[in-house]
C-alpha cells in the first residue's frame, strides 16, 4: 500500500476467498479498508457456494465504478430477477453460510495435515486462507503423466501442477466431502508405495 501511495497507483485485489479464514470467525480487513484507491472484487461463487448465480461485486473509487457501470451496460445490462432474489437471500444469511464454509475448510485442512505427517513422498505448506493448495510430490515424474497414471489406476484425480506452471505439484481443494477426501488420500498413499525407493529432492 505504501508503494502504491507513493506513486499514486491503484491496487486491484480479488478477495473471492475472503471469509474462510479458518483461524478466526471475524472477517479480515479488505484492501479497501486501508487504501482509497483500492479496487476489490468478490462473488457468490466460492465462499458462499453459489457459483450458479454468476453474481459478484466490485468496490472501488467512484470514478472507477462509473467506468465499470458504463462498460457493464454493454456486456450484461442486467441480471435475472430470480438470481437477484436468491443472491439477497444468500447475503441475508451470510454468517451461517460463511461458518459452514469455514467449518468444511477447517475439517479438511486438518485431515490433509494428518495425512501429510504420515506420507513421506508428499509435502505442502497449507495456506491460512483460501480453499486450495498445491501438494509437492518428491518424484521425478511430470505432473500431467503422474496425474493421468494415478487416475487410470485408482480413479483419484488431481489437476497437474503443469497447468499452473508449477511442475511436480498437484492442485488440491479443501471443499470436497470429508469422506471423499479421506478415502481419496488413503487410496493415493497406497498407490504411492510403488515409488518408495524413487524419492528424490526436486529443485524448484
Predicted regions and their residues:
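PLP-dependent enzyme catalytic core of the Aspartate aminotransferase-like
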Residues: 140-141, 148-158, 164-204
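Conserved core segment of the aminotransferase class I/II
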Residues: 37-106, 113-115
Amino acid at each position: 500500500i505504501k508503494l502504491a501511495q507513493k506513486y499514486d497507483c491503484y491496487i486491484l485485489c480479488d478477495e473471492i476467498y475472503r471469509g474462510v479464514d479458518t483461524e478466526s470467525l471475524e472477517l479480515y480487513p479488505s484492501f479497501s479498508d486501508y487504501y482509497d484507491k483500492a479496487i476489490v472484487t468478490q462473488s457468490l461463487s466460492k465462499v458462499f457456494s453459489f457459483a450458479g448465480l454468476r453474481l459478484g461485486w466490485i468496490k472501488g473509487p467512484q470514478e472507477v465504478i462509473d467506468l465499470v457501470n458504463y462498460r457493464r451496460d454493454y456486456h450484461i445490462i442486467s441480471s435475472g430477477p430470480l438470481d437477484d432474489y436468491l443472491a439477497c437471500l444468500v447475503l441475508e444469511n451470510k454468517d451461517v453460510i460463511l461458518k459452514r464454509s469455514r467449518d468444511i475448510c477447517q475439517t479438511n485442512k486438518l485431515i490433509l495435515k494428518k495425512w501429510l505427517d504420515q506420507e513421506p513422498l508428499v509435502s505442502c505448506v497449507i495456506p491460512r486462507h483460501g480453499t486450495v493448495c498445491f501438494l509437492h510430490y518428491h518424484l521425478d515424474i511430470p505432473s500431467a503423466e503422474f496425474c493421468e497414471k494415478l487416475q487410470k489406476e485408482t480413479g483419484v484425480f488431481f489437476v497437474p501442477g503443469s497447468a499452473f506452471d508449477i511442475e511436480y505439484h498437484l492442485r488440491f481443494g479443501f471443499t470436497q466431502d470429508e469422506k471423499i477426501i479421506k478415502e481419496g488420500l488413503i487410496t493415493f498413499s497406497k498407490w504411492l508405495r510403488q515409488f518408495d525407493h524413487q524419492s528424490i529432492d526436486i529443485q524448484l
